[in-house]
Amino acid sequence: MATTNTIEGVNLHRRCFFGAAAVSIAVSQFGMMGSAKAQSDETRLSAIKPGAHTSFGPLKQIDAGLLNVGYAEAGPGDGPSVLLLHGWPYDIQSFVDVAPLLASAGYRVIVPYLRGYGTTRFLSSETFRNGQQSVVALDIIAFMDALKIEKATLAGFDWGARTADIIAALWPERCKALVSVSGYLIGSQEAGMAPLPPEAELQWWYQFYFATERGRVGYDKNRRDFSKLIWRQASPKWDFDDATFDRTAASFDNPDHVAIVIHNYRWRLDLADGERKYDDLEKRLAEGPVIAVPTITMEGDANGAPHPDPAAYRNKFSGRYAHRTIKGGVGHNLPQEAPQAFAEAVIAADRV
């Protein structure tokens, strides 16, 4: 059974302790139980077993910026908005159990496919298939504009956490609160060129593979087997079945998937150019901007993917902050492996 170890708040609570008491503890850990309003806003979450849900309702599509974005939506249309952002090699299925939990708590939950995944498509065949970090964040800003969402709680992991971090840092007026797995993930090409200790470099083996033409062709040819290998390495204790993987892997059939993934990782190493029109944004991100919105960072105790130590990024968050380590063999795909803990963090971060 997974447990949550929380820094800067109550020390420990069991993830199986659900219902109003669980949310009460989650909120108090974030230092928000001092007011009568906070206490009256407690929400009862139903207990959920990871993997209880296998699909969303009918997907929606909307033109937003350079894309026609595919997305799932749950919960009341007039509820406070929460955007859940996935990473690589994952998709919206990472939140298939989180979304109904948050919807039952009254949130409008929106889960988009990032560029290069699922049913999201470029509006023009002429658009450069760019995977650099600032562009993915701009996609989400355009998506929020298209849905007329002025401000939302943003929560994600991997690419999704980085995207949420960027929006919180550069456009804090659009981000009510932040939940970021593995913390502060904003990077730069300069930082990406710095050598790491050998063991750390080994964890990034796929990035160096993608730097070669052989790697691009190999990923294109073997994207499902490749992604399943990454799942196993990133979440070594997660006993997912083939059906769970296959539901996500269908998203990798997107015609732009390989181009976006390869460009993303080559751009990080300064082996591929971005677009000049985004240079100013990248310069700002390279400065490592501090995030001031209320934030909860999270980490699984069995994350086999490269990730920073929480102490290394603590000073990157200047507002209300807590860190939660989710124990019990939880790996990189934290929302899908520990949906209850992730949903609790979203509610706690939102209720400042």
Segments (PLM) and residue ranges:
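N-terminal secretory signal peptides
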Residues: 1-16, 23-26
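Flexible "cap/lid" subdomain of the alpha/beta-hydrolase fold that forms the substrate-access gate
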Residues: 41-57, 66-69, 74, 81, ...
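C-terminal alpha-helix
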Residues: 345-352
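Conserved beta-strand scaffold positions in the cores of enzyme catalytic domains, especially
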Residues: 59-61, 109-111, 323-325
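Boundary at the C-terminal end of the N-terminal hydrophobic targeting segment
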Residues: 36-40
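Catalytic histidine-centered segment of alpha/beta-hydrolase-like enzymes
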Residues: 330-338
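C-terminal segment of classical bacterial N-terminal signal peptides
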Residues: 28-35
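Conserved HGGG/HGGXW glycine-rich cap/lid loop of the alpha/beta-hydrolase fold
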Residues: 74-119
